[in-house]
Amino acid sequence: WRQIAELSGMGFEIGNHTKSHCDCRKISGQDFLAELTYIEEKCREHAIAPPRTFAYPGGPVAENVIGILKERGYVTARSCGDTTFDPQRDDPFRVMGVPVQDNTGNKFFEAVQRATDSAYTVLVFHGVPDLPHPWVNTEPARFEACMEYLAEQNCRVIPMREIFTAGQ
């Protein structure tokens, strides 16, 4: 949590992803609330802003928890997919993020090229690095190359929370 607090202090958005990385489609509302609350309390203990964004563990959208997320003040929830997100058209609790990791080839570049002024590409870097979970690992050199490409393309990179809290 010390490292997470450092990232928060650097301006990184800290979202909720549950305590146990459970399949949210298969648990009760009470159990889901306990999963959310654990992370919220940890954030509070470490002086991290309360999470307002959520990432569905494992990727699939869990329709059964969207109401709870809204009640708790979350503004968006992200799954995994290969599409852009248009906040004027798309549901903020069914955002599809493009995973970027060592095993996804050119998907990063293809996804960035699809972005427009009104349809955003949501990029998901699960771990840089994430050696205990090699299936979602992104080596630091690849991450740096991706960041350089975004800069070269004059891409504007913003946290998810800013898409949904502008003007509030």
Regions found by a protein language model. Give the residues of each.
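Catalytic grooves of carbohydrate-active enzymes
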Residues: 26-27, 98-162
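Metal-dependent polysaccharide deacetylase catalytic core of the NodB/CE4 family, i.e.
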Residues: 1-75, 80-96, 118-130, 162, ...
